[in-house]
Amino acid sequence: MAIWTPGEAVLATDSKVTLSGGGAVLPAEQSCKIRTSGRFFYAIAGLYNHAPTGFDAWRLAEGAIAGATSVNEAASRAERRIQPALEMALADIRRRDPQDYARRYAEVWLAIWIAGTERGDPVMAGREFLPGRTVAREFPGASGAGAKGEIGIAIFGERQAIDSAYGDVQAIGRLVEAKGPAAAARALVELEIAGEPEKAGGPISMARIRTVRTTTGGAEWIERGLCAGPR
């Protein structure tokens, strides 16, 4: 979950990772889904790794984001690093196990969202890798959601329970206005965990960046969950 307002950007995730192999669903694992690289927070959902092709989304993202000077540059660099390796991995999965591919990756392959600051203000950029195309999004945008004074919302990862409860992004926007970005993000992740326990599970991890005129840009963990380490 990524939520942006003019004064605050929040990333929130669950920790459950579902695995599969040879057509069989394997026991779920727990993992941190928010990482840091330099002055950026970033979160990934979708295919994290694929051993037969050596695909590792976290390693590729870290290498791309580390040298970036802006959030949008970080997202563009991550796209260039991830996309060819991801296409190779998904082609191999589809060849080896077409049923697993259809069940897990027919609509969305992977999404990455990055949060940071520019001129002291929170900025977010994302890439959603879909079969046949990649969608680029950024908050604030030139117009529409995420424009000045508006709210930017992106649901990535499991979302069926959220969609069933709220129906559209405008309803989620009203929740953000009522509760604030952090409380709304937590409520939405909790809703997804309760609604799809076979696919989503705690603990929750949350990070945010607020408008603060300091060198850190107001970057902080709200709740680490399984995300250990500095900051």
Q: Residue locations for each model-derived region?
A:
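N-terminal nucleophile
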Residues: M1-R231
